[in-house]
From Swiss-Prot:
Domain ABC transporter: 309-586, 606-936
Role according to the record: The UvrABC repair system catalyzes the recognition and processing of DNA lesions. UvrA is an ATPase and a DNA-binding protein. A damage recognition complex composed of 2 UvrA and 2 UvrB subunits scans DNA for abnormalities. When the presence of a lesion has been verified by UvrB, the UvrA molecules dissociate.
Keyword Zinc-finger attached: yes
The protein's assembly and partners: Forms a heterotetramer with UvrB during the search for lesions.
Keywords: ATP-binding, Cytoplasm, DNA damage, DNA excision, DNA repair, DNA-binding, Excision nuclease, Metal-binding, Nucleotide-binding, Repeat, SOS response, Zinc, Zinc-finger
Chain sites annotated for binding ATP: 31-38, 639-646
Zinc finger residue ranges, C4-type: 252-279, 739-765
CC annotations in GO: cytoplasm; excinuclease repair complex
Intracellular or extracellular location(s): Cytoplasm
Identification of the protein by name: UvrABC system protein A
Chief place of localization: cytoplasm
This protein's record includes keyword tRNA processing: no
Length: 940
């Protein structure tokens, strides 16, 4: 069968659609945000493909796998087992790294266990057990006629006179020994000092190097090794020539350091055999940070330099008073004026020094006690360790920072694993390389003999996987990069690379916008990867808005014509030419140029006196970057993937502004030197793609604040007043008006062992969340449940006479969310939708004209038409005097910006510099900027 037949698909907003999709092709599903693309791709095709595959397994196997809900569709045939590669499921496990997710690290562990060379951490010499034959051969390689002696170390750096030892050696017939570097006669040994460390090596043989010495040397080595426990030394009889140390043990010949046999688990930081004992393989240690604990060093302790230890907290302040009396310092002097030693005592304690503390209880009784002062940092640490209260822990977490582990230096591995080498390179050094550099390392790695044979297959797997990561545009990442720091797009492309590595055939892959976070330059490589996946014999279904991806597809499906209830139909399908020729296709109109996002005729001019200057940003790969952001403009931060955009804006600029403008205490900016110009703003708002809530109780109505005035409206009706209902009656989060059978959830979870957990509508409220009495109250003929089921568009019309609600609903429509329901669970919103709900909430607030807005790729999940709407909103914010800073790859957004700051020139270590800045017209002329190359044609 060469096609997938879909008949009568009605999942979510799909309107009974019929489709014939070619198999083993690259198919792009496009359309407006909310038109039903994901409903078709993920909730219908993927869900049914996955469900049928899992259903074919035994009942025992099914209990370990989650079974997808059966989609609302009459008939689908021609499906393959389905694999979905989404953006959502980035691991939050601190033990997951790029290396472990892609399995490259597993192959590296195997490689180091099989061909690695262990060395002594102190002497850097290889640990290798040598046979007597190897030792003899090594000696015979020395210049012919060289006068040498064979020594057996008996005493190594030990105190004592060692009279008995020397007598025993003489009794065994040995004539000479080397004591502390001097050769002497055992018939008349020197007297050794009792309290000094001595080294005694007995001379087993003296000889001139000749080819016929094999037998004699073998016997001498045997004697020496037996005497010393496996160590022998060859030293020149005259002069200070180089000595050769031999070991018959798997140990360092100098200090005896030995290691267990190399196994892959020794190199795993998730296994006790390989993890650093101090940080348990996490690579970082948590500690109470003095910089966070000291709230304001300009204040005195009495005024609250350290929160919780001021005059308001009587118990702790009593302790500080006694401490001040003992060390003679002033509690009313600014903390930063106290001597370093006093500050140290306050923070870290008095050590063993006992202090007399005066404690006064509520009745005024005085009690004197002598004990050392624990120190504020140690007190916080003890409280954090001992408490069982979550609220106390949450409060104390504010004062905790992380630093690289002092034992392993952040490598996560124990000492033994850190000292195994392949051609002078350790495993921690490999994983710190960028993927591109690691690929170069293995491509040029030369091993010899048996080691080359052993490593051949493993290195092929490593090279293939690294090449796949480069092909999806991730050449700038390190293998040691923690998975929780990856963006959604990066995580998705890593999973894509892993799938290519698996080399499956006959599978249906469903991808959700793989081009997110990818610069135009890297897009071509991604598309080649997708076509490669298709050419292996797979059906590749991609939900995508990127123009290049749509043009590259074998078959395009355009869902529309609008969003939500106005969508759910197949507007156009077929080849690229058929889409362009279809007058009903909004996508086709934008691709053909009939519709387009217009380049502004003039840019808002920059006021050179109103800028924010960030000096010396050096986090991650940034190279002492000086950032200048114009105030009151719409600025775009551009650059290839991994060039340092997120580090500069999210990790440095936003966190500094968040701390200084919003008073945040937990934001830890990346390293920088100074910042000036933040006085132009009254607050900073970061509108990111994190969920608006992590439970189904969170929804757009509660998040944007619309639900409160709606509840007040219901409580103001005649029926409510006569019953005495207050606004709280209409909340599904508190007792009173909600259905207690399901506690306001509307559904009840039923655990099924062989099947997925089933959520059934509550029997009592029938999924309406409220009890019968609450639902009897109507506003304009609608109950509270019916209002929550309305789309934003319907609600806007319904609440038009209520300005406070209508205004907030209008902002949701302005950002293209007319189709979402007011009570839609936050967990069902995509990252792009969550970001736009946040944007709508900010738009609905009273505007001061002095706000700094920071957005990271707001075009995620947006069609050309949606981008037009978003730009209208962002330009409106700018026109009110606010400053908008957007990290973006989308050229339609970049070309409408007032100012561009382009980072590069490459990703990873090849980036981290500002290579161009100015208006789009200025930047387009810059040589060496990848952004300029793609932007130039857009401005014509």
């Amino acid at each position: 069968m060469d096609k997938i037949e879909v008949r009568g698909a009605r999942t979510h907003n799909l309107k009974n659609i019929n489709l014939t999709i070619p198999r083993d092709k690259l198919i792009v599903i496009t359309g407006l945000s909310g038109s039903g693309k994901s409903s078709l791709a993920f909730d219908t095709l993927y869900a049914e493909g996955q469900r049928r595959y899992v259903e074919s397994l035994s009942a025992y196997a099914r209990q370990f796998l989650s079974l997808m809900e059966k989609p609302d569709v009459d008939h689908i045939e021609g499906l393959s087992p389905a694999i979905s590669i989404e953006q959502k499921s980035t691991s939050h496990n601190p033990r997951s790294t790029v290396g472990t997710i892609t399995e490259v690290y597993d192959y590296l562990r195997l490689l180091y266990a099989r061909v690695g060379e262990p060395r002594c951490p102190d002497h850097k010499v290889p640990l290798a057990a040598q046979t007597i034959s190897q030792m003899v051969d090594k000696v015979l390689e020395l210049p012919e006629g060289a006068k040498m002696m064979l020594l057996a170390p008996i005493v190594k750096e030990r105190k004592g006179e060692h009279v008995k030892t020397l007598e025993n050696l003489a009794a065994q017939g040995f004539i000479r020994a080397r004591i502390d570097g001097e050769t002497c006669d055992l018939t008349d040994p020197p007297t050794l000092e009792l309290h000094k460390k001595h080294t005694i090596e007995v001379v087993v043989d003296r000889f001139k190097v000749r080819g016929d010495l094999q037998q004699r040397l073998a016997e001498s080595f045997e004697t020496a090794l037996e005497l010393s426990g496996g160590i022998a030394v060859i030293a020149p009889m005259e002069g200070d020539g180089e000595e050769i140390v031999f070991s018959a043990n798997f140990a360092c010949p100098h200090c005896g350091y030995s290691m267990q046999e190399l196994e892959p688990r020794l190199f795993s930081f998730n296994n006790p055999a390989g993890a650093c004992g101090t940080c348990d393989g996490l690579g970082v240690q948590q500690y109470f940070d003095p910089e966070r604990v000291i709230q304001d060093a300009n204040l005195s302790l009495a005024q609250g330099a350290i929160r919780g230890w001021d005059q308001k907290n009587y118990y702790y302040f009593q302790m500080l008073t006694s401490l001040a009396e003992h060390y003679d310092f002033d509690l009313h002097a600014p903390f930063n004026s106290l001597s370093k030693r006093i500050q140290e005592v306050i923070l870290k304690g008095s050590g063993r020094t006992e202090i007399e503390f005066k404690y006064i209880n509520d009745r005024g009784d005085i009690r004197l006690k002598r004990h050392p002062f624990e120190g504020i940092l140690n007190t916080l640490e003890r409280r954090y360790r001992d408490t069982e209260s979550n609220s106390v822990r949450e409060e104390l977490v504010k004062y905790i920072s992380t630093k690289p582990c002092t034992s392993c230096g952040g490598t996560r591995l124990r000492l033994e694993a850190r000292n195994v080498f392949i051609n002078d390179t350790t495993l921690p050094q490999i994983v710190e390389l960028s993927i591109a550099d690691a690929l170069t390392f293995f491509a040029t790695l030369k091993l010899e003999g048996q080691r080359a044979q052993i490593a051949e297959k493993v290195m092929k797997e490593i090279n293939d996987r690294l090449q796949f990561l480069v092909n999806v545009g991730l050449n700038y990442l390190n293998l040691s990069r923690s998975a929780e720091t990856l963006s959604g797009g990066e995580a998705q492309r890593i999973r894509l690379a892993s799938q290519i590595g698996a080399g499956l055939v006959g599978v249906m892959y469903v991808l959700d916008e793989p081009s997110i976070g990818l610069h135009q330059r890297d897009n071509e490589r991604l598309l080649k990867t997708l076509t490669h996946l298709r050419d292996l014999g797979n059906t590749v279904l991609v939900v995508e808005h990127d123009e290049d991806a749509i043009r590259c597809a074998d078959h395009v499906i355009d869902i529309g014509p609008g969003a939500g209830v106005h969508g759910g139909q197949v507007v156009a399908e077929g080849t690229m030419a058929e889409i362009l020729a279809n007058p009903d296709s909004l996508t086709g109109q934008y691709l053909s140029g009939a519709k387009q996002i217009i380049v502004p005729t003039q840019r808002t001019p920059r006021d050179k006196n109103k800028t924010v200057e960030l000096i010396g940003a050096s986090g991650n790969n940034l190279k002492e970057v000086n950032l200048s952001v114009p105030v009151g403009l719409f600025s775009c931060i551009t650059g290839v993937s991994g060039s340092g955009k997120s580090t500069l804006i999210n990790d440095t600029f936003f966190k500094i502004a968040h701390t200084q403008l919003n008073g945040a205490t937990t934001a830890q900016p990346a390293p920088y030197k100074s910042i000036k110009g933040l006085e132009h703003f009254d607050k900073v708002i970061d509108i990111d793609q994190s969920p608006i809530g992590r439970t189904p109780r969170s929804n757009p109505a509660t998040y944007t604040g619309i639900f409160t005035p709606i509840r007040e409206l219901f409580s103001g009706t005649q029926e409510s007043r006569s019953r005495g209902y207050k606004p709280g009656r209409f909340s599904f989060n508190v007792r009173g008006g909600r259905c207690e059978a399901c506690q306001g959830d509307g559904v009840i979870k039923v655990e099924m062992h062989f099947l997925p957990d089933v959520y059934v509508p509550c029997d009592v409220c029938k999924g309406k969340r409220y009890n019968r009495e609450t639902l009897e109250v109507h506003y304009k003929g609608k109950s509270i449940d019916e209002v929550l089921e309305m789309t934003v568009e319907d609600a806007h019309e319904f609440f038009a006479p209520v300005p406070v609600i209508a205004r907030k609903l209008q902002t949701l429509m302005d950002v293209g969310l007319s189709y979402i329901r007011l009570g839609q669970a936050a967990t069902t919103l995509s990252g792009g939708e969550a970001q736009r709900v946040k944007l709508a909430r900010e738009l609905s607030k009273r505007d001061t004209g002095k706000t700094l807005y920071i957005l990271d790729e707001p075009t995620t999940g947006l069609h050309f038409h949606d981008i037009q709407q978003l730009l209208t909103v962002l330009h409106r914010l700018r026109d009110h005097g606010n400053t908008v800073v957007v990290i973006e790859h989308n050229l339609d957004v970049i070309k409408t910006a007032d100012w561009i700051i382009d980072l590069g020139p490459e990703g990873g270590q090849g980036g981290g510099e500002i290579i161009a800045q100015g208006t789009p017209e200025d930047v387009a002329q810059i040589e060496g900027s990848h952004t300029a190359r793609f932007l130039k044609p857009m401005l014509k």
